[in-house]
Amino acid sequence: MFFGEFEYKLDEKGRFPLPPGIRPSMKDGLILAPGTGEKCIYAYPLCEWKKLSESLKSTTVAPSKMRRLNRALFALAFDVNLDAQGRLTLPAPLKSYAGVNIEVIVAGVNNYIEIWDKETWESEKKASQEQAWQIIETLEGN
């Protein structure tokens, strides 16, 4: 399980270290994919990506919608590894998609992490916090 918010700066080669607590889960590799409907990058441990892939295969959604979802997730995904220092290099297409410049936020989101440009994250975090309690109340049936 991933949680927490971590701030980093990209080095001159576009790399940043993943938080030490996250690295062991990513030792076998990770998949980077564009956030669906959000200007961020999703980072899944390989085992979680496989689970997602399998769950999508068994989903009963209209074929045309499923093709679109598969294109959005899989066609633009990258299989990457951390370097010996635990750093991650963001592929240029995903970096551009998420608008990542120098400062990045790594946010733990249960079974995956999200990578955001710092400025974009601040806006999203505020919006998420404002809606979180409303969502919890809905889940609790209040």
Curated annotation (Swiss-Prot):
GO cellular component, one term: nucleoid
Database matches in CDD domains: MraZ_C, MraZ_N
Domain SpoVT-AbrB: 5-48, 77-120
GO BP annotations listed: negative regulation of DNA-templated transcription initiation
PROSITE patterns noted in UniProt: SPOVT_ABRB
Primary site of residence: cytoplasm
Residue runs in coiled coils: none
Keywords assigned: Cytoplasm, DNA-binding, Repeat, Transcription, Transcription regulation
Molecular function GO labels: DNA-binding transcription factor activity; transcription cis-regulatory region binding
Protein localization: Cytoplasm, Nucleoid
Assembly notes: Forms oligomers.
Family to which this protein belongs: Belongs to the MraZ family.
The protein's name in its UniProt record: Transcriptional regulator MraZ
